[in-house]
C-alpha cells in the first residue's frame, strides 16, 4: 500500500449510499425518518426459463417477489417480507424463500428447474429518511441524501434526476451566479418537493396496504393480457412513466376490451 494522500476541494459531494461516511462525518441531520419496513433476501440462479424482468406482489401474504436477468445469464431473484418476519427468515432462509416462491406456483416451478449459483444474501438495514443534503463544503446525493425501501425501485431514478439538479446548483454557486448556499438550499427544496408524494406512496405500498377497488377492476381487465398486465405492474412501480398507462384513453381502451 502507498502512503496516504490528502486531497482538498471547495466542495465534497458524497454519493456513498445510505450509510454515507461523509454524512456521518459532517453530522448531516436526518428528517422524515421511518424505520425499515421490509427485509429482502436474494440469490442468483442459472437455467431459469424467465422473462428479463418479473414482478409479483401478494398483499395478503405480505410478499413482494421480483427477478431479472444479469449480465452473466443468471437470474437474480429477490423476496421481500415484513421486518416482523425477519427472524423467521434468518432461522430458515432457504425454506422461507421457497415457501414465498410457492405463492406463485408457475414461477416456483421454473426456479426449481434451474440451479442456484450462489449463496443467499439478506438485507434488513433499509430505513426510510431524508438527510439535509448540503452544508459548508459538502453535499449529498442519491441514497446518501434520500433513502427509501426498494419496494417501488425508485432510488436510481430519483438519484439520476437529483444529480442533474445538484450539478446545476453547484455550477451556479461555484460559477458566481449566486451564493452557493442559496443554490444548494434551492436544490434541497426542489428534491423534497419532487420526491414527497412517491416517498409516502412507497412507504404505504411497502406496508402492503389494501389496494383500492379500482385497481382490482383494472387487474381483472388485463388478466388475460400478459403484455398489458406487465405494463400495469411496471407503471404502478414507476418502472415506466405512470402516465403512459394510467391515462383516460388507455384505461378506456382496456375496459372496452373486457365488454
Labelled PLM ranges:
Residues 2-6, 11, 15-113, 117-119:
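Conserved FAD-binding catalytic core of PHBH/FMO-like flavoproteins
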Residues 168-259:
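C-terminal helical "tail/cap" subdomain of flavin- and related membrane-associated enzymes
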Residues 9, 46-50, 112-118, 123-124, ...:
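Short flexible/disordered coil segments
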Residues 23-24, 83-91, 153-156, 219-236:
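Short secondary-structure transition/capping segments
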Residues 29, 85, 151-154, 206:
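Conserved short-loop catalytic and cofactor-binding motifs
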Residues 87-181:
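FAD/FMN-dependent oxidoreductases across multiple families
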Amino acid at each position: 500500500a502507498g502512503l496516504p494522500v490528502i486531497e482538498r476541494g471547495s466542495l465534497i459531494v458524497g454519493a456513498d449510499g445510505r450509510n454515507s461516511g461523509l454524512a456521518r462525518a459532517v453530522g448531516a441531520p436526518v428528517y422524515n425518518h421511518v424505520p425499515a419496513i421490509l427485509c429482502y433476501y436474494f440469490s442468483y440462479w442459472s437455467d431459469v426459463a424467465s422473462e428479463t424482468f418479473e414482478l409479483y406482489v401478494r398483499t395478503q401474504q405480505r410478499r413482494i417477489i421480483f427477478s431479472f436477468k444479469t449480465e452473466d445469464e443468471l437470474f437474480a431473484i429477490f423476496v421481500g417480507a415484513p421486518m416482523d418476519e425477519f427472524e423467521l427468515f434468518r432461522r430458515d432462509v432457504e425454506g422461507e424463500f421457497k415457501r414465498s416462491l410457492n405463492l406463485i406456483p408457475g414461477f416456483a416451478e421454473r426456479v426449481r428447474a434451474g440451479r442456484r449459483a450462489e449463496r443467499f444474501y439478506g438485507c434488513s438495514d433499509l430505513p426510510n429518511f431524508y438527510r439535509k443534503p448540503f452544508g459548508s463544503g459538502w453535499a449529498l446525493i442519491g441514497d446518501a441524501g434520500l433513502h427509501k425501501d426498494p419496494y417501488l425501485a425508485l432510488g436510481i431514478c430519483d438519484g439520476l434526476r437529483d444529480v442533474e439538479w445538484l450539478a446545476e446548483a453547484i455550477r451556479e454557486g461555484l460559477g458566481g451566479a449566486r451564493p452557493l448556499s442559496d443554490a444548494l438550499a434551492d436544490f434541497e427544496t426542489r428534491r423534497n418537493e419532487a420526491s414527497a408524494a412517491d416517498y409516502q406512496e412507497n412507504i404505504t405500498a411497502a406496508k402492503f396496504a389494501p389496494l383500492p377497488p379500482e385497481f382490482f377492476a383494472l387487474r381483472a381487465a388485463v388478466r388475460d393480457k400478459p403484455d398489458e398486465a406487465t405494463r400495469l405492474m411496471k407503471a404502478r412501480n414507476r418502472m415506466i412513466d405512470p402516465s403512459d398507462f394510467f391515462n383516460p384513453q388507455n384505461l378506456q381502451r382496456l375496459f372496452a376490451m373486457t365488454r
